[in-house]
Amino acid sequence: MNDNPAVNKVFNEISSLYKQYFEYAIKVRKWLEIPDDLSHREIGYGMLKKVDNRNMSFNTDGEYLTWVLKESPFHLYKSLSYMEYPDVVGGAAKKGLFKREVAFDIDTHKTEKCTHDDSWICEECLGEARNQVLILIEDFLFPDFGLSEKDLKIVFTGNRGYHIYLKPENPELLKKIEKWGKNERRYFIEYILGKNLNLRNMGSRWKNILIREFKKNKIATKKFEKTSDWKTEIDTRKDTTRRTIYETIGKVKSRLELDEKVMDDDIRLLRTIGSLHGYTGLMVKEITYSSLKNNQFDPLNHGVFSKFHKIMYKVNIKQEIDPLTLKGDTFDHKSTEIPASYLLFLFGHGIDFEILE
């Protein structure tokens, strides 16, 4: 604990709020995910750091839930991998990895339209995260891999991103992708990111995506549609057109902010569905593809634990900060009475404030 009573008061209050949340999420709503085959999954958690400890495992659901209720961690994780020895310290070989979930992590940065500090969030950067999920699904996962909405699990991370799990209903396909090794997963994500794009032998999916973008930039596409050797065709164009073509290809290849380590790392941890994100206090929440597609999910509304928006605190915020809107209410450094939902966000971002009597 800190020697400063005001700091201790804030930490104790934050800890109490997390405990209240887990009591409700576990005992009342059954929100908290219990990872499949729990005894073969590694569990990690963080309090003041993103990850304070990992290499934990639990034999039963009850043991796991009892631990969560007792500790009420600010960050809670489970491994994507299934392991024979999840509590052993070391890599995949020591842990005895025998299969692994396949998931994408889209984690966006602030956009050109954002007016806030890099670490803050707003409708613009959250909207960009949504758009990137739809690009991943509609440009690749649906048409290229024959997946449907029922084959995906989409999770809002509680910050500026989403996790997209591949969960095919076909048991044989699910078994196959969960047996993928690092090389197969690496090939998968590099294809989607266009890292190995061969302009002398363009595949149909990337050809269709790029032709669509060329048309937006008023680049003639008829000859590109008829050939797979794009390099030769590009070389016939004028310098300005050629430059525009390469710039367009570059922008398309870089439009997805995918965390490649999540696909590459054999023993990667991801946030547990139904927990809270320790930096924002927002819920790690599973949503449907249709709610995302139809813009029915608003992270700054539906990601807020409603009960925490009704508990109010008198505070003194000691530094200037950007505004943040939660559930339609906007707060900033001038706010003197704030809900617990905003209190968690301030704490997670290391903002200097005190709770008043």
From Swiss-Prot:
It comes from the Archaea. Its cofactor is Mg(2+); Mn(2+). Its EC number is 2.7.7.-. GO terms for cellular component: DNA-directed RNA polymerase complex; primosome complex. The active site is at residues 105, 107, 259. Keywords: DNA replication, DNA-directed RNA polymerase, Magnesium, Manganese, Metal-binding, Nucleotidyltransferase, Primosome, Transcription, Transferase. GO terms for molecular function: DNA-directed RNA polymerase activity; metal ion binding. SUPFAM superfamilies: Prim-pol domain. InterPro entries: DNA_primase_S (IPR002755), DNA_primase_ssu_euk/arc (IPR014052), DNA_primase_ssu_PriS (IPR023639). One of its GO terms (biological process) is DNA replication, synthesis of primer. It is an enzyme of class 2 (transferase). Belongs to the eukaryotic-type primase small subunit family. Catalytic subunit of DNA primase, an RNA polymerase that catalyzes the synthesis of short RNA molecules used as primers for DNA polymerase during DNA replication. The small subunit contains the primase catalytic core and has DNA synthesis activity on its own. Binding to the large subunit stabilizes and modulates the activity, increasing the rate of DNA synthesis while decreasing the length of the DNA fragments, and conferring RNA synthesis capability. The DNA polymerase activity may enable DNA primase to also catalyze primer extension after primer synthesis. May also play a role in DNA repair. Heterodimer of a small subunit (PriS) and a large subunit (PriL). This is DNA primase small subunit PriS. The gene is priS.
